Amino acid sequence: MSEFNNVSVVKEANIYFEGKVTSRTVIFPDGSRKTLGLMLPGEYTFNTGSAELMEILSGEMTVVLPGSPDPVAIKGGEAFEVPENSSFKVNVTAVSDYICSFL
C-alpha cells in the first residue's frame, strides 16, 4: 500500500536525537496509530512501550534486537518486529524512510 486514506495527521513532529530522527503520527479511523519517519545516518537506541513493527521503505541500517547480541542488516523493503517494553539499537548507514506500526 503506497498511501493511507481517511486518516488524521498530528501536525507536530516527533523529534529525537537532536533532529536526526523525525516522524509524524498518523491516526486511523479505528484509533490505531502509525508513525511515518526519517532517520539520518547515526547510532540510536529506542525504547518501546508497546510492540512495534518497523517497515523500512528505503535506506540501510543494522539493528540489534532484544535478546540478540548480533546486529542484523536491514534495507529498504524489509521489516522487523520489536517486543513491548524493550529497547533496540540501530546503526543507520544511509538515510532511512520508515513506518512504525504499534501492535
Swiss-Prot record:
Pfam families per the UniProt record, alphabetical: Ppnp
Signal peptide: none
Enzyme class: transferase
Function field: Catalyzes the phosphorolysis of diverse nucleosides, yielding D-ribose 1-phosphate and the respective free bases. Can use uridine, adenosine, guanosine, cytidine, thymidine, inosine and xanthosine as substrates. Also catalyzes the reverse reactions.
Keyword Cell division part of the UniProt annotation: no
UniProt family annotation: Belongs to the nucleoside phosphorylase PpnP family.
Keywords, comma-separated and alphabetical: Glycosyltransferase, Transferase
Catalytic activity: a purine D-ribonucleoside + phosphate = a purine nucleobase + alpha-D-ribose 1-phosphate; adenosine + phosphate = alpha-D-ribose 1-phosphate + adenine; cytidine + phosphate = cytosine + alpha-D-ribose 1-phosphate; guanosine + phosphate = alpha-D-ribose 1-phosphate + guanine
EC number: 2.4.2.1, 2.4.2.2
Gene Ontology MF term list: guanosine phosphorylase activity; purine-nucleoside phosphorylase activity; thymidine phosphorylase activity; uridine phosphorylase activity
GO CC annotation: cytosol
SUPFAM superfamilies linked: RmlC-like cupins (SSF51182)
The keyword Transferase appears for this protein: yes
Gene3D superfamilies: Jelly Rolls
Protein name: Pyrimidine/purine nucleoside phosphorylase
Organism: Citrifermentans bemidjiense (strain ATCC BAA-1014 / DSM 16622 / JCM 12645 / Bem)
